């Protein structure tokens, strides 16, 4: 598990019409997290991802600035190294009918103030790819141990996130795959 930290924008609710396995025209939605420093970069990536998806109508795109402090990388992600606007895509190969995906894990850290001796708490959210919510908890514990986290913490909430991919710079990807 490695951390992806940076400025992220979220391309939420990219909606278009496509065909299902039976050939019927159906609405399709997808969400992607992209490392972008500004709205213009995210918009450029969104339009690149939408290219060719307008066969049955317009593509609706909503871009939301999302501050994501950490995404823990692991081999649950499949990787597409073909660059899209200079970014590598991490995605999930499993169908949407499974629990495989990105999970938001909310943590509360407990710190002891050295001057007063009182315990202070701070909140954090880490996104982690996993096959299930219980595996997300295991992955977070492993990630924090490898990161050298020494503070006590409590996992408060584990929530499935609808993002279907995470797009990162080649440099971030190289840092993630180093053993």
Task: Map each language-model feature to its residues.
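Intrinsic disorder/low-complexity detector
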Residues: 7, 24-25, 48, 52-111, ...
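Short amphipathic, charge-patterned alpha-helical segments
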Residues: 42-50, 136-141
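Surface-exposed interaction/gating patches
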Residues: 87-137, 141-143
């Amino acid at each position: 598990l490695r951390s992806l930290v940076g400025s992220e924008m979220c391309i939420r609710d990219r909606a278009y019409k496509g065909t299902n396995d039976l050939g019927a025209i159906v609405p399709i939605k997808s969400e992607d997290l992209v490392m972008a420093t500004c709205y213009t970069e995210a918009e450029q990536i969104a339009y690149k991802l939408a290219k060719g998806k307008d066969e049955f109508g317009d593509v609706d795109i909503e871009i939301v600035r999302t501050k994501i402090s950490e995404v823990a990388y692991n081999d649950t992600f499949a990787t597409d190294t073909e660059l899209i606007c200079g970014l590598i895509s991490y995605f999930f190969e499993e169908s949407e009918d499974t629990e495989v995906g990105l999970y938001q894990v909310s943590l509360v850290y407990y710190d002891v103030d050295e001057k007063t001796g009182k315990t202070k708490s701070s909140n954090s959210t880490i996104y982690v790819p996993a096959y299930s919510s219980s595996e997300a908890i295991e992955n977070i514990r492993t990630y924090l141990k490898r990161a050298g986290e020494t503070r006590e913490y409590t996992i408060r909430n584990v929530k499935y996130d609808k993002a279907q991919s995470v797009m990162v710079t080649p440099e971030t990807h190289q840092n993630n795959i180093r053993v």
